């Protein structure tokens, strides 16, 4: 066993003394059992994580029952909804790397035989997956689960995105103070990840198709008995996989990454999943070309439209058959998925999901009646984004295939929000927000406030927004993010000027500023080099090492040190 490194031999008697002092070893034979880390992310200020201590206790009991010894440790967590719109958002994406580094440190320092990961919200899930790829120790994931959708006094379904859009509607005068407060009190009624197809739930669904989690991981409610039983079953399966030496990199292959993007297309998932899945591929040693994503989109139908793109919540998806029903439907179309891959269950993706039929065709559409014949995400290329940009086409009004407008440029998120709120931004504008990428932000902050304000003011079809920053999973409208290279790295988005005509073509997947190359070249000559916004602490180190979004926004060691 891997853990023999710390518990076998006379020279490890001091280590064994310390292990006895933990109280985790209940009998002399326990030293001969596998040591399993429980990588938890319990934290009081994140509603998606407040119940994870209870889930970890269930996992511990089941791991012992299965014949192994559990040791729990915790990672940090950032709630993107609470960190939104201020300096806190600069720490959100960088927290993913801290989580991966922290988990790697504990796992490798103590030579665990397996790891039970309990994530739930936005950056915690991908951070833990990065750790699993990096350490490549037998592992299983069981998330905390989504919260129930809220309900307004008028019987309208609510999610967190409803609240962000309500801010714009309240400022406009479209809703009363009483309606506004009612929504605030009822939008998030239970613990769990936010109820729509936002980043957290997108990633928790993708773990099913990647093969790292059990079926229904992405949709079973946080407060359900099914979630607790899933924890138990996952613990049993992990101990079995330790014995069989089934490792994360055996499961997460190039084909698994393809299938993750296919499910994302079918469910209209968050654009952040592109960023995180590319980072996962990078950590797994897979060189993944962004062009593959468009090829996947072309062959993958859009089957389930979930909040914020509709009123359906994750619980509605669960009741309609969950991710297994969507996977089963996609498997009926040859070439859409790679169903004979091994998964954490020890069975193939096909064996896990075959026969799981759709129970509600309003929530999950069948192959012969999709929302769209193509997937809900697109990668755009052009002279603004030579290395790619991402748009959630599932969140764009279906009548819009192209949008051409005049650029109105901002070098920060806050400047853009102020201009939207004071009505400087008008119909026909393309809002350009730059120097908000991984390096420029730093931390690639989410642009939910500006996009929500645009939609809340009734301009969702009349104003576009492009940025080297990223979006919340709750974002909808004509919103293009992840523009690469970013402005801070000298990307062409830095060359756009007010009044430039910009065309977003969703049919041909292009993003261009309609200026001659010689004009852009002259502008580049006078471009001021980027200077880091943060000079000390973690964000300064992050700025120095992070890459643009096309590689997942990962931190890379300088080539001269390799």
Swiss-Prot record:
Pathway(s) served: Amino-acid biosynthesis; L-isoleucine biosynthesis; L-isoleucine from 2-oxobutanoate: step 3/4; Amino-acid biosynthesis; L-valine biosynthesis; L-valine from pyruvate: step 3/4
Keywords of this entry: 2Fe-2S, Amino-acid biosynthesis, Branched-chain amino acid biosynthesis, Iron, Iron-sulfur, Lyase, Magnesium, Metal-binding
Binding locations of Mg(2+): 80, 122-123, 446
Cofactor: [2Fe-2S] cluster; Mg(2+)
EC number: 4.2.1.9
Function summary: Functions in the biosynthesis of branched-chain amino acids. Catalyzes the dehydration of (2R,3R)-2,3-dihydroxy-3-methylpentanoate (2,3-dihydroxy-3-methylvalerate) into 2-oxo-3-methylpentanoate (2-oxo-3-methylvalerate) and of (2R)-2,3-dihydroxy-3-methylbutanoate (2,3-dihydroxyisovalerate) into 2-oxo-3-methylbutanoate (2-oxoisovalerate), the penultimate precursor to L-isoleucine and L-valine, respectively.
Protein name: Dihydroxy-acid dehydratase
Gene transcribed to yield this protein: ilvD
């Amino acid at each position: 066993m891997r853990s023999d490194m710390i518990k076998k031999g006379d020279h490890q008697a001091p280590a064994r003394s310390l292990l006895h002092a933990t109280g985790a070893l209940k009998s002399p034979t326990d030293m001969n059992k596998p040591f399993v880390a429980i990588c938890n992310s319990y934290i009081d200020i994140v509603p998606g994580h407040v119940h994870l201590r209870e889930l970890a206790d269930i996992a511990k009991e089941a791991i012992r029952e299965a014949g192994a010894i559990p040791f729990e440790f915790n990672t940090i967590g950032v709630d993107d909804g609470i960190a939104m719109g201020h300096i806190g958002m600069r720490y959100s994406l960088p927290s993913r790397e801290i989580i991966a580094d922290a988990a790697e440190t504990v796992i490798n320092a103590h030579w665990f035989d397996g790891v039970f990961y309990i994530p739930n919200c936005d950056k915690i899930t991908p951070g833990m997956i990065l750790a699993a790829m990096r350490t490549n120790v037998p592992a299983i994931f069981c998330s905390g689960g989504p919260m129930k959708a809220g309900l307004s006094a008028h019987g309208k379904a609510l999610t967190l995105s409803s609240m962000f859009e309500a801010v714009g509607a309240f400022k406009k005068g479209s809703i009363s103070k009483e309606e506004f407060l009612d929504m605030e009190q009822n939008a998030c009624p239970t613990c769990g990840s936010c109820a729509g197809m936002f980043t957290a739930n997108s990633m928790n669904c993708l773990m099913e198709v990647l093969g790292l989690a059990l079926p229904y991981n992405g949709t079973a409610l946080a407060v359900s008995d099914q979630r607790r039983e899933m924890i138990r079953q996952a613990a049993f399966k992990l101990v079995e996989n330790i014995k069989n030496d089934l490792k994360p990199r055996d499961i997460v292959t190039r084909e698994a990454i393809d299938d993750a993007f296919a499910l994302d297309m079918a469910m209209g998932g968050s654009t952040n999943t592109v960023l995180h899945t590319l980072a996962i591929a990078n950590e797994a040693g897979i060189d993944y070309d962004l062009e593959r994503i468009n090829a996947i989109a072309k062959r993958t139908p859009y089957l389930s439209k979930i909040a914020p793109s509709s009123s359906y919540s994750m619980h509605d998806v669960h009741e309609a058959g969950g991710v297994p029903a969507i996977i089963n439907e996609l498997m009926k179309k040859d070439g859409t998925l790679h169903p004979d891959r091994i998964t954490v269950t020890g069975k193939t993706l096909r064996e896990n999901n075959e026969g799981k039929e759709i129970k509600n065709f309003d929530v999950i559409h069948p192959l012969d009646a999709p929302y769209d014949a193509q997937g809900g995400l697109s990668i755009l290329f052009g002279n603004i984004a030579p290395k790619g940009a991402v748009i959630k086409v599932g969140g764009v009004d279906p009548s819009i295939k192209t949008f051409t407008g005049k650029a109105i440029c901002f070098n920060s998120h806050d400047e853009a929000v102020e201009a939207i709120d004071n009505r400087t931004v008008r119909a026909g504008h393309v809002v350009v927000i730059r120097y908000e990428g991984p390096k420029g932000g730093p931390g690639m902050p989410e642009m939910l406030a500006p996009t929500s304000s645009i939609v809340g003011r009734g301009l969702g079809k009349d104003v576009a927004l492009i940025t080297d920053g990223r979006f919340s999973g709750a974002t909808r409208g004509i919103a293009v993010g992840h523009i690469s290279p970013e402005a801070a790295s000298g990307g062409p988005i830095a060359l756009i000027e007010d009044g430039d005509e910009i065309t977003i073509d969703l049919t041909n997947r292009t993003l261009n500023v309609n200026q001659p190359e010689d004009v852009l070249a002259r502008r580049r000559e006078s471009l001021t080099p980027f200077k880091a916004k943060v000079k000390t602490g973690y964000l300064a180190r992050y700025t120095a090492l992070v890459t643009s979004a096309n590689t997942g926004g990962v931190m890379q060691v300088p080539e001269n040190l390799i």
